[in-house]
């Protein structure tokens, strides 16, 4: 699945908004996701090697927000269960790691 320029812009804004709402640092997210802070920042900017990475970050942020009793801000493209998208590796997403 490829995103249009507008969809990419919106998705980056949505990830950033939920990242800020979760109140985590790049360092904390990187540690939790078994990667480096620079990699988390790259995923926030949709500069990814694997198309599953934004889904992994989305799931992580949603869990962080749920643990705080907060509701994630809506996503326009990263919606629902990634398993419905045949092109995504759901096993990779389920691992919850960005390494």
Language-model region placement:
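Residues within the helices of the helix-turn-helix
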Residues: 27, 38, 59
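Short alpha-helical "recognition helix" segments of helix-turn-helix
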Residues: 25-31
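A short, Lys/Arg-rich alpha-helix, primarily the initiator
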Residues: 1-21, 59, 63-71
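Recognition helix of helix-turn-helix/homeodomain-like DNA-binding domains
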Residues: 35-50
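Residues in the recognition helix of alpha-helical DNA-binding motifs
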Residues: 18, 32, 43
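Helix-turn-helix/homeodomain-like alpha-helical modules used for DNA recognition
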Residues: 70, 74-99
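Short, basic-rich loop-to-helix N-cap that marks the start of a DNA-contacting helix
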Residues: 47-59
């Amino acid at each position: 699945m490829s995103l249009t320029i507008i969809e990419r812009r919106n998705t980056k804004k949505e990830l950033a908004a939920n990242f800020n709402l979760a109140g985590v640092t790049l360092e904390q997210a990187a540690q939790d996701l078994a990667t480096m802070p620079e990699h988390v920042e790259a995923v926030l900017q949709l500069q990814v090697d694997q198309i599953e990475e934004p889904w992994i970050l989305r799931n992580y942020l949603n869990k962080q927000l749920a643990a705080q009793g907060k509701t994630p801000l809506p996503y326009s493209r990263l919606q629902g269960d990634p398993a419905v998208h045949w092109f995504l590796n759901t096993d990779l997403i389920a691992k919850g790691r960005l390494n």
